[in-house]
UniProtKB/Swiss-Prot annotation:
This is Putative pre-16S rRNA nuclease. PANTHER family: POLYNUCLEOTIDYL TRANSFERASE, RIBONUCLEASE H-LIKE SUPERFAMILY PROTEIN. CDD domains: YqgF (cd16964). Keywords: Cytoplasm, Hydrolase, Nuclease, Ribosome biogenesis.
Length: 155
């Protein structure tokens, strides 16, 4: 559950894993511990499919948004970080909701591990691999749910 100084009230929260071709989206509740992958949004060049994101937002009615902050394992910038921060600012401006950044180091590795486990158990197939971005978003959102005070606010 978010602490009193969390920027979000209790309610639904969306998490995002920003990539150069796709943005993974996950949903969780600010009073719960788990998150679920719900969508993969296409990115064409630098243009996000805002119509698809608008539908996700309308379906879930979030009270806040969590965006993965891509850093190298050593904690340094990497090229996608600028795009992720720009996307976070666009989300805040478009939806007028609080947005925070969460360190996403190794989230893709954890997502791949979860996907492999689901495949081995027969829950996922190779053709479902495009959901990896949404699974990574769920990992990012779960990190925020576990410790919301580790998030960074947008400037």
């Amino acid at each position: 559950m978010p602490e009193a100084s969390s920027p979000f009230p209790d309610g639904i929260v969306l998490g995002f894993d920003v990539g150069t071709r796709r943005i993974g989206v996950a949903v969780g509740s600010a009073w719960g511990a788990g998150a679920r992958a719900v969508a993969v949004i296409d990115v064409h060049g630098v243009a996000v499919d805002w119509n698809a994101l608008d539908r996700v937002k309308r379906n879930w009615l979030p009270v806040g948004l969590v965006v993965g902050d891509p850093l190298t394992l050593e904690g340094h910038d990497q090229p996608i970080r600028k795009q992720a921060h720009a996307f976070a600012c666009q989300l805040r401006e478009r939806y007028r909701l609080p947005v925070v950044l969460v360190d996403e180091r190794s989230s893709s590795v954890e997502a791949a591990s979860r996907f492999a486990g689901a495949r081995a158990a027969g829950y996922k197939r190779r053709r479902d691999a495009d959901t990896l971005d949404a699974i990574a978003a769920a990992v990012i959102l779960e990190r925020w749910l576990a410790d919301p005070m580790q998030a960074t606010s947008l400037p």
